[in-house]
Amino acid sequence: MRSLPFGFPKILVSSAAAIPGLSTRFIQTSDILLFHSVVEIAGLTGLLKNVLDRAGLAMAGMLQGPATEPSADRSRAIAMTMLSPCERCARMVRVALEKNGYSVVGFHATGMGDRAMEGMISEGL
């Protein structure tokens, strides 16, 4: 699933979604929607069927929306990492850049955000 392009609808239903640190291994730097099943995926119980029905409806909703294309004008785009203690400064920098015609895309500076930023730059997004 991670090899599918950014913006392509992806849903992963997992009973392990709430295990600390494990979801990072599933998602890594992709835009996968992680849907916690709460109940174990073993036999089609009424509760599991409800979870799978809702996951299917979520996917159907995503498929009804317009396909998102990367920005046509990437020449004026700037990727910027942001972190809570520096948010005020980052916001001021973002506003100044936007006033000068740049499109600023913010990424969280910890965890997978920095790697996601590098990956998206490599993909030309």
Question: Where would I find each of the regions flagged by the language model?
Answer:
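Solvent-exposed alpha-helices and their adjacent loops that cap or buttress functional pockets
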Residues: 3-6, 25-28, 68-75, 96, ...
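Glycine-rich phosphate/diphosphate-binding loop of Rossmann-like nucleotide-binding domains
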Residues: 75-111, 115, 119-123
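Short, low-complexity, polar/charged sequence segments that are solvent-exposed and flexible
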Residues: 7-8, 30-33, 52-56, 97-100, ...
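Short, acidic/small-residue loops that bind anionic groups at enzyme active sites
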Residues: 2-27, 33-41, 103-109
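Short acidic, glycine/serine/threonine-rich loops at helix termini
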Residues: 2-3, 21-27, 45-48, 89-94, ...
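Cap/lid and interdomain-hinge subdomains that line or gate substrate/regulatory clefts
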Residues: 21-85
